[in-house]
Amino acid sequence: VSGVGLPDFKYTEAAIGMDVAANFEGYPEQCYVSLVGKGLGLDRQHAIDLGLPGLTTGDLVDMLRTGAMPKINQLAGTYYVYPQMLDYIRRADIISVQVGSNDALVPALVALGNATNWKSEQLVATLISGVLRTPSFENLQRLNSGLSRLRLTREERKATTQLLLGGGTDAICEQAYQDAAVNMPQVVAQLRALNPDAQIILLGYTNPVPLLPEWTQLFRRLNALGKSLAAQNENVTYVPIPFAMTATDAHPTVSGHKYIANRILRAVKK
């Protein structure tokens, strides 16, 4: 695909759903969109980041219909009107998608905020930093220590403990999976309708809160969903990223972006 005044390139890549940067040409050099672009010999007009912060699978379904969300997502506090997105998708040769984590993370963070009366910012950073990645007694102590530093009232501590350790996010994770199971087939179908020829890459998921069993199960199911959708649809490739490291905001670290880029490049059909 070539653009006006630009040299010809073999590929145009559009990346959807990972909110690396709001500006489609303003993403960091170290992010996976940039690294994949370089690996395919693309400049920034041809390696395009379409990720939007806080986007859920339902939001993406709406965006792929009209280029806009019909209303604000109240939990995430997001509202996007981005009709150019559809043009980029129509022109792309490779479309990578990772969306679904926010379906669980957004309501869970709101629930945690409500439980702590919004004293929970530091605890959230600890939970998604990766330091609690391995289930162990030491990490349970670390979690309890983090709760203690919040200076919660008795009622707040009880509500937070129930949410985090008493299965309080079970319903959130189940609803997130059900939403993704309904929406992700629509996402794939809408992408294919917009662009019949592009290779669609469904990126796998990493678990930002692996200490909690219900979250481990959720992301295992989301990965299975992505793999199943790829098997059911022509020219759709599932790319697992089990070892992508995440930072305190649940997004990939620099090394995580490099790992994801390498996984995508290996999956691209030459």
Per-range role (PLM):
Residues 1-63, 114-116, 253:
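Serine-esterase "nucleophile elbow" of acetyl-processing enzymes
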Residues 14, 34, 46-48, 70, ...:
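Residue-level marker of intrinsically disordered, low-complexity segments enriched
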Residues 25-28, 63-69, 211-217:
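Short, flexible/disordered intra-domain loops and linkers
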Residues 32-37, 68, 186-189, 224:
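Short, well-ordered amphipathic alpha-helices
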Residues 73-269:
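Alpha-helical cap/lid subdomain in secreted, periplasmic
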